[in-house]
A protein has these predicted regions:
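A short helix->loop->beta-strand "cap" motif at the edges of active sites that frequently abuts
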Residues: 84, 121, 176, 279-283
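Residues at the N-termini of beta-strands
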Residues: 54, 123, 238, 283-284
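Acidic-and-aromatic substrate-binding clefts and catalytic sites of carbohydrate-active enzymes
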Residues: 34-36, 58-71, 94-105, 131-135, ...
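N-terminal pre-domain/capping segments
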Residues: 1-123, 152-155, 165, 172, ...
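Short, flexible, mixed-charge acidic loops at enzyme active sites
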Residues: 31-34, 132-144, 247-256
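Hydrophobic alpha-helical segments and helix pairs
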Residues: 117-149, 153-160
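Short acidic/histidine-rich active-site segments
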Residues: 284-290
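Acidic/histidine-rich catalytic cores of soluble enzymes
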Residues: 10-15, 23-30, 54-55, 81, ...
Length: 312
């Protein structure tokens, strides 16, 4: 696995904390968008105390691209004062083909790319997954209930390709990569479809966010993680990593899943990462975990990654 051109080692690889544990709208109805710098600092202290040196300002927590420039600069200064860098920005449930808000989210995507350039982030993650349905919001684990599906319509597929290509060209001008998040029932919802989609986009800076955890957690038949990873590895870019226990009863068809620490779930990340490295993978990671103290589990996952990534 020696690669003398690799830009990071296991000690220096950028491994960011996700902010999925923290909502944008707080219990009192106020928004993180309007918090003071001191209030932001209280939240980010959790990230620092968990040992992270990288942060993904996930837009389910804070929409940096929608902050006034002066407020954004205040946020960036705060992160630097806390010893945090921001290698990437992830977007969530703002699909550029949303039937109601697609145009709005496309414009937002361009602002995210500009914001990434302004804060020094080299990666942005986009997806085609829609808002949670009411039934999903009521479920203990939202992925056990079917959500919004991308239409099986060639015209919408072409529109999605065109819009991601547009964003990709913008990002390319700024030296930024785009990673499209694997998520069920979307155009990036299987390995085969994801590869077909990024191939149709046809830009070297547009690849796949190989978030296989989003698929193996489903209570339905899914392709085994290993052939999925083999297909997407040549296209892997900024990578959301999480894992799940998965039990399948072949006689009854019962499937049960539950969030797991990265090293314990059904996906062997030592093997998966080696597949990606063999194809030159050199993008940051994002650690995320649902349930319990997800930030602390993500910190343990970060430490696991540092044990299995290349020494040099």
């Amino acid at each position: 696995m020696a690669n003398t051109s690799r830009k990071w080692t296991r000690e220096t690889w950028q491994i960011a904390a996700a902010m999925i544990q923290y909502p944008n709208v707080l219990a009192d109805g106020s928004s993180v968008q309007d918090q003071s710098v001191e209030q932001w600092a209280e939240t980010l202290a959790d990230v620092v105390d968990a040992g992270f040196t990288e942060l993904d300002p996930t837009d389910s927590w804070i929409r940096l691209a929608d902050l006034p420039a002066a407020r954004r600069d205040d946020f960036v200064k705060l992160t630097r004062d806390l010893g945090l860098s921001m290698p990437a920005i992830s977007t969530s449930r703002r699909s550029v083909i949303d039937p109601e808000h697609g145009d709005e989210y496309l414009a937002y995507g361009h602002r995210v790319i500009d914001t990434a350039a302004a804060i020094g982030a080299g990666s942005v993650s986009f997806g085609f997954f829609g808002p949670l349905t009411d039934a999903q919001k009521k479920a203990l684990w939202f992925w056990t209930v079917d959500g919004v599906k991308n239409p099986e319509d060639p015209a919408v597929w072409r529109q999605a390709v065109q819009r991601i290509r547009e964003l990709g060209r913008h990002a390319e001008e700024l030296g930024i990569e785009l990673a499209l998040e694997m998520y069920e029932d979307t155009y990036i919802g299987s390995a085969d479809s994801a590869v077909r989609f990024v191939t149709d986009v046809g830009l070297p800076n547009v690849g796949i966010n190989a978030d296989l955890g989003n698929l193996v957690r489903l209570h339905r038949p899914v392709e085994h993680w290993q052939p999925m990873m083999a297909k997407v590895a040549p296209f892997a870019k900024y990578w959301h990593v999480k894992n799940y226990y998965r039990t399948e009863d072949e006689t009854s068809g019962l499937v049960v899943t539950h969030p797991a620490p990265l090293e314990f779930g059904v996906i062997n990340y030592r093997a998966a990462i080696r597949m990606a490295l063999a194809h030159g993978f050199d993008s940051p990671f994002l650690c995320e975990h649902y349930g319990g103290d997800g930030l602390s589990v993500s910190a343990a996952n970060r430490d696991y990654l540092r044990r299995i990534l290349p020494r040099d």
